[in-house]
């Protein structure tokens, strides 16, 4: 009995023992690199897939069928179209059959099925089940061919006609409403909202930042668009409690309002890795051994329907590129701006990115190089401008700003000819 209690109330259950922790973190998530116990690294399962679907299965749900039937409208909206069409057809056919049986029983009890009887029938021209079924269809769909009609002989028949008319209106309203709600769901809008394949960590304005890119493939806007992010990882509390997926908010500018974006062209979302960030103690070496997932969420209202949509994606630790930046996609033309989505997922390496954590960088344990680093964004913009000028017949300049044999990864050690640079926002 004691052994049973020991297994039952142990700090980490046998199932949790099977989940190998890549790191056992302290403080705000990752420690400083000295307090970690590294185990055999494994590729964790995604909690949120790249297409936004949650990788979760519910089991042992009590009274699942009753709970789904209690919220039948939401159930009809969420199910697949094939099942929705089955419910659509069954709702009408079963109601026609039910009331057809009722009118047939009324005719049977009143003796209307006897052809030799000359008394007034409850429902004229209803002398078989087929005729009763057709009368039910005509009543509920308000067709009224004129051959079959209810009489004042039987009050029950009159009541059933009124009752079927009301039931038919309810079925029409429910089924048509569910179909329209399903068609108007903004879920398909997510097909034209994209996240970059990889997130990056690089310096921006003198601070180490986590960045990812979002884009809108439609010209219609996403109203009140805003972003948020969470870091998911396993951890053990100071009391010994094991939390399989601890959710930690990642600040993307909620307090200052910069989490709200104007998503006309692709935008890079920036998370400044400061002392409040769960990535504050994470270095390049720690990133290679880390086991976590960053879930990114984009929310907004569809301009056409004013319905709220949510687009999701996630990045595992091995999908975050340290020391990279995104290639520019927005270029200024003569009378408009051009967005090149072929560059949307592309990145380039920034050689001078510090490999230490943001904490070490803030404590001046890593000295940043003062050498002028090569600005790839400006080079791309100038190259694009030269290509456009050559297409328009403008002769190319014979002078070059950069020697052709220079390795781009070693630009920090090569003196560049001074020239006016342009920010990516200006590109």
UniProtKB/Swiss-Prot annotation:
<feature type="topological domain" description="Cytoplasmic">
    <location>
        <begin position="179"/>
        <end position="427"/>
    </location>
</feature>
<comment type="similarity">
    <text>Belongs to the inward rectifier-type potassium channel (TC 1.A.2.1) family. KCNJ2 subfamily.</text>
</comment>
<dbReference type="Pfam" id="PF17655">
    <property type="entry name" value="IRK_C"/>
</dbReference>
<feature type="short sequence motif" description="PDZ-binding">
    <location>
        <begin position="425"/>
        <end position="427"/>
    </location>
</feature>
<keyword id="KW-0407">Ion channel</keyword>
<feature type="topological domain" description="Extracellular">
    <location>
        <begin position="148"/>
        <end position="156"/>
    </location>
</feature>
<keyword id="KW-0851">Voltage-gated channel</keyword>
<feature type="intramembrane region" description="Pore-forming">
    <location>
        <begin position="141"/>
        <end position="147"/>
    </location>
</feature>
<dbReference type="InterPro" id="IPR013673">
    <property type="entry name" value="K_chnl_inward-rec_Kir_N"/>
</dbReference>
<keyword id="KW-0472">Membrane</keyword>
<dbReference type="GO" id="GO:0086008">
    <property type="term" value="F:voltage-gated potassium channel activity involved in cardiac muscle cell action potential repolarization"/>
</dbReference>
<dbReference type="GO" id="GO:0005242">
    <property type="term" value="F:inward rectifier potassium channel activity"/>
</dbReference>
<feature type="short sequence motif" description="Selectivity filter">
    <location>
        <begin position="142"/>
        <end position="147"/>
    </location>
</feature>
<feature type="transmembrane region" description="Helical; Name=M2">
    <location>
        <begin position="157"/>
        <end position="178"/>
    </location>
</feature>
<keyword id="KW-1133">Transmembrane helix</keyword>
<keyword id="KW-0702">S-nitrosylation</keyword>
<dbReference type="Pfam" id="PF01007">
    <property type="entry name" value="IRK"/>
</dbReference>
<keyword id="KW-0633">Potassium transport</keyword>
<keyword id="KW-0406">Ion transport</keyword>
<feature type="transmembrane region" description="Helical; Name=M1">
    <location>
        <begin position="82"/>
        <end position="106"/>
    </location>
</feature>
<dbReference type="GO" id="GO:0008076">
    <property type="term" value="C:voltage-gated potassium channel complex"/>
</dbReference>
<feature type="intramembrane region" description="Helical; Pore-forming; Name=H5">
    <location>
        <begin position="129"/>
        <end position="140"/>
    </location>
</feature>
<protein>
    <recommendedName>
        <fullName>Inward rectifier potassium channel 2</fullName>
    </recommendedName>
</protein>
<dbReference type="GO" id="GO:0051289">
    <property type="term" value="P:protein homotetramerization"/>
</dbReference>
<keyword id="KW-0630">Potassium</keyword>
<dbReference type="GO" id="GO:0006813">
    <property type="term" value="P:potassium ion transport"/>
</dbReference>
<dbReference type="GO" id="GO:1990573">
    <property type="term" value="P:potassium ion import across plasma membrane"/>
</dbReference>
<keyword id="KW-0813">Transport</keyword>
<dbReference type="GO" id="GO:0086091">
    <property type="term" value="P:regulation of heart rate by cardiac conduction"/>
</dbReference>
<feature type="modified residue" description="S-nitrosocysteine">
    <location>
        <position position="76"/>
    </location>
</feature>
<dbReference type="InterPro" id="IPR003271">
    <property type="entry name" value="K_chnl_inward-rec_Kir2.1"/>
</dbReference>
<dbReference type="GO" id="GO:0042802">
    <property type="term" value="F:identical protein binding"/>
</dbReference>
<feature type="region of interest" description="Disordered">
    <location>
        <begin position="384"/>
        <end position="427"/>
    </location>
</feature>
<feature type="topological domain" description="Cytoplasmic">
    <location>
        <begin position="1"/>
        <end position="81"/>
    </location>
</feature>
<keyword id="KW-0812">Transmembrane</keyword>
<dbReference type="GO" id="GO:0060306">
    <property type="term" value="P:regulation of membrane repolarization"/>
</dbReference>
<dbReference type="GO" id="GO:0014861">
    <property type="term" value="P:regulation of skeletal muscle contraction via regulation of action potential"/>
</dbReference>
<dbReference type="Pfam" id="PF08466">
    <property type="entry name" value="IRK_N"/>
</dbReference>
<dbReference type="GO" id="GO:0055119">
    <property type="term" value="P:relaxation of cardiac muscle"/>
</dbReference>
<dbReference type="InterPro" id="IPR014756">
    <property type="entry name" value="Ig_E-set"/>
</dbReference>
<dbReference type="GO" id="GO:0015693">
    <property type="term" value="P:magnesium ion transport"/>
</dbReference>
<dbReference type="GO" id="GO:0005546">
    <property type="term" value="F:phosphatidylinositol-4,5-bisphosphate binding"/>
</dbReference>
